[in-house]
Regions:
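Paired acidic/hydrophobic, glycine-rich loop segments that form the ligand-binding mouth/hinge
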Residues: 4, 42-49, 129-135
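General small-molecule cofactor/ligand-binding pocket signal
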Residues: 25-29, 116-120, 246-248
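Secondary-structure end/capping motifs
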Residues: 174-239
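Hydrophobic residues within well-ordered alpha-helices
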Residues: 37-40, 125, 236
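Short, glycine-/small- and polar/acidic-enriched structural segments
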Residues: 12-86, 95, 99
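Pocket-lining segment of extracytoplasmic ligand-binding domains
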Residues: 118-200
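Bilobed "Venus flytrap"/periplasmic-binding protein-like clamshell domains
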Residues: 1-20, 72-128, 227
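Long, low-complexity C-terminal extensions of enzymes
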Residues: 241-251
Length: 251
């Protein structure tokens, strides 16, 4: 079976937690390409949650995903120093539909501000505007402690955990098989973070932050996480971006 995932510290540790991944063909992709790959062939993918909206045919695992319930997450917002009014924000890193759609909604709902969103591939420090960074660079470069957690903003908005990614497939059978693949995933996932030697490239302050907060990250979904998924994919409807409310095909 092929398994597609975006690449970040959390997904890497999901893969490292699998008891027997020799039968899996695992491939890390940019987050924006995972769903496309899942649609092209019978496979399992950890897709950005808002991709459910444009891919209603996909079956969604009700048991496994990547959910954030506090400050630790994969995306942080950084404000330009001395900025009194927020008008523009630049997105960079491993972007997907989640960040491009939710950034505007977050600032509209929580700050009553209509922001203009742009994309950039420039180095983080060369961008002098407000910015949102997705991925490991938040930690490897030590930026995170200056940033505002996107998960905290989303949690405040939907009153539920921020499920950033969900496991999905065109095949009901593959979703069924995933329960065996991810059996006892949570304890093995957390164990990966208990040994600091298993995390390379992180400065000490980032390593300590991740380890101290890792239990706010969930890879085995509960009812509150499923409610978080439902609330998240309804936000674009409430803001007039889509015409109908989408119901995930949970299995």
């Amino acid at each position: 079976m092929k398994l597609f995932l975006p690449k970040n510290i959390f997904t890497e540790k999901i893969v490292d937690s699998l008891e027997d991944n020799s039968k899996l063909e695992i491939k890390f992709l940019p987050a924006s390409l995972v769903t496309k790959s899942v649609l092209l062939e019978d496979s399992l993918g950890l897709i950005p949650t808002l991709d459910i909206i444009k891919c209603e045919e996909l079956f969604i695992s009700s048991k496994f995903g990547l959910s954030f319930d506090d400050r630790l997450c994969n995306s942080y917002i950084y404000f330009k120093e001395g900025e009194n009014e927020l008008e523009n924000i630049v997105l960079l890193g491993d972007l997907s539909s989640v960040e491009t759609v939710l950034t505007k909604i977050v600032f509209s709902e929580l700050y009553d501000t209509k922001v203009s969103v742009g994309l950039s591939e420039k180095p983080f420090n060369s961008i002098l505007e407000n910015k949102l960074l997705v991925g490991n660079q938040n930690f490897t470069d030590g930026h995170f402690y200056k940033g505002l957690s996107l998960s905290e903003e989303i949690i405040e908005l939907i009153s539920a955990p921020f499920v950033n990614y969900v496991f999905a497939s065109k095949s009901e059978e593959i979703i069924g098989k995933s329960a065996k693949i991810f059996e006892n995933l949570s304890p093995k996932f957390y164990e990966q973070f208990e040994n600091q030697n298993l995390i390379s490239g992180f400065p000490q302050n980032a390593l300590e932050f991740v380890r101290e907060n890792i239990y706010s990250v969930n890879v085995e979904l509960e009812e509150q996480d499923r409610e978080g998924i439902n609330q998240l994919i309804r936000l674009p409807y409430y803001h007039g971006l889509i015409e109908n409310i989408i119901e995930p095909k949970f299995l």
